[in-house]
Amino acid sequence: EGVKVMDAVFRCGNGEKCTDNFHHFGLAAIIDIQTGIVVTPAIDKLNQKYYIHPRTKEQIVGFKIPSWTKIINTVKKAALVKPNIRFIGWDVAVQENGRICIIEGNCTADPDITQMPDQIGKWPKYREVIFER
């Protein structure tokens, strides 16, 4: 019923490049949807694990995403603009002033990034929601 947030991923640059693009060696880690806390080590596309960010030396697991409830509410509201699209991967940034900024919505979001950090396939979960009537 309504919009369902299926997964959330924390993405960041690797310390050498400023991009968070996973396929250009950005890092990705799973966020607990309920709490907004990062629950897995980050990985890169070579599946190297990072418990500590290589440049900032900040701990990754346990990091609390700022303004998490606002992020969830923002993407749910945005998803209602086109309710006939059953699957959207939202790229969202939290600005320094706390403002939530939607960068883009992807109707062909990359499934790698939601599955590699915890090594759990997501298709059964997604299929159920995408095809429910």
Predicted regions and their residues:
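Phosphate-binding site of ATP-dependent enzymes
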Residues: E1-D44
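Phenylalanine-focused residue identity feature
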Residues: F10, F22-F25, F63, F87, ...
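A short acidic/small-residue loop/turn micro-motif
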Residues: G13, L46, T108-D110
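C-terminal active-site "lid" helix and adjoining low-complexity regulatory extension at the edge
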Residues: Y51-K70, L80-I85, V94-R133
